[in-house]
Every structure is written in C-alpha cells, then in structure tokens.
A protein has these predicted regions:
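Glycine-rich, basic loop-to-helix element that forms the pyrophosphate-binding segment
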Residues: 28-45
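Short aromatic/hydrophobic "clamp" motif used to bind/position activated sugar donors
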Residues: 50
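Acidic donor-binding segment of Leloir-type glycosyltransferases
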Residues: 1-28
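Short, flexible, basic/aromatic active-site loop/helix in glycosyltransferases
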Residues: 83, 101-122
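Conserved nucleotide-sugar donor-binding
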Residues: 46-47, 126-140
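Conserved donor NDP-sugar-binding/catalytic core segment of glycosyltransferases
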Residues: 62-96
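Acidic donor-binding loop at a coil-to-helix junction in glycosyltransferase catalytic cores
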Residues: 149-155
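The conserved acidic donor/metal-binding loop of glycosyltransferases
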Residues: 54-58
Length: 166
C-alpha cells in the first residue's frame, strides 16, 4: 500500500485516489510537523519496511524501491537505507558540490564505530528519500516530535546508538 500524506489549507478539498493501492490522508497545514507527520504515516503501515519520500523527489528510474531494499541485505544490522540525491542539471555550482559531498557515488555503511572519524556526520540520513526497517523503527519509538527538520538524522542517531547501522 501507498499512503500519501497531503498537507491542506483550511477549506481546501483533499486530493482523491482512483487507485485502490493508494490511500490519501489529508493533514491540516496548521497540524503539520515533520516528525509527527512521518510517525503518523509509519503508524498506518503493516509492512516490514516503510519508505518516506518528499513530494519534490524525482527518481532517476523505476528501480528506486528495489534498489533501496537491497541495502537491507548487505548486513543484518542495517535499519535505514537512504537514496542518493543528485543536483538538477541546471543547479548552481554550490548545489552541485553539496550533493557530491553529501551523496558520494559509492554506498557506505555507518555504525557506531564511525563516530570517532565522522563525528556527527555518522548520523546523516536523507530526509528526501529513506526506507526504514519497520520493526527496528517501532522498537526505537519512531520519529521524535515536534520536529521541524532533520527528523531522519535524529532517527539515524537512535538507530546507530542502538548498535544498528545506516
């Protein structure tokens, strides 16, 4: 199932889905909170894995989900896998360099052992596109809220501190 959480203004009519696999849940703009909204979405799911993706994410092909799920087969401790974010072709040089630095072209596995070398960057996790092992997510209490940004990084810190990996 796909759960679409749509932020709406007062009086705005929520979108409707004609696909039985897609359920739309409107959230009043005044009630929106990054951590709480994602926690709400996760609570709707009965799946083994939950994926969070922002409305402006543009997958480069139709293999995004299956490629992300492969990350969970690398090591049994993996609890979060996030997607690589590329700069748009028309982006300025700062945007391009930021994406290259934050999202290198090689995957990595981050654990508590990386804290000495990477510091806080050990906890980096994209808030644009990430998949969570639902069992671990639930065991760790899910997203913290209220949270206005970095909800995925906060969750990644909980995952790594509990001896899981990202």
């Amino acid at each position: 199932k796909i759960f679409l959480l749509q932020t709406i203004e007062d009086g705005e009519k929520p979108m409707e889905s004609n696909d039985p696999k897609i359920e739309v849940y409107p959230i009043a703009k005044k009630d929106f909170d990054h951590g709480h909204t994602r926690a709400y979405g996760a609570s709707l799911s009965k799946a083994d894995y939950v994926m969070f993706m922002t409305q402006d994410a543009m997958p480069v092909d139709d293999r995004l989900t299956q490629e992300l799920l492969k990350g969970f087969t690398i090591e049994p401790t993996v609890a979060i896998v996030y997607g690589r974010q590329l700069a748009r072709p028309d982006a300025d040089i700062t945007e391009k360099m930021t994406r290259i630095h934050s999202y290198p072209d090689k995957s990595s596995l981050k654990t508590k052992a990386d804290l000495e070398q990477l510091g806080i960057k050990t906890y980096f996790c994209s808030d644009v596109c990430a998949v969570y092992d639902k069992k671990v997510y639930d065991e760790l209490g899910g997203f913290v809220y209220p949270t206005i940004f970095n909800e995925d990084m906060i969750m990644a810190s909980k995952v790594i501190q509990s001896d899981h990996s990202v």
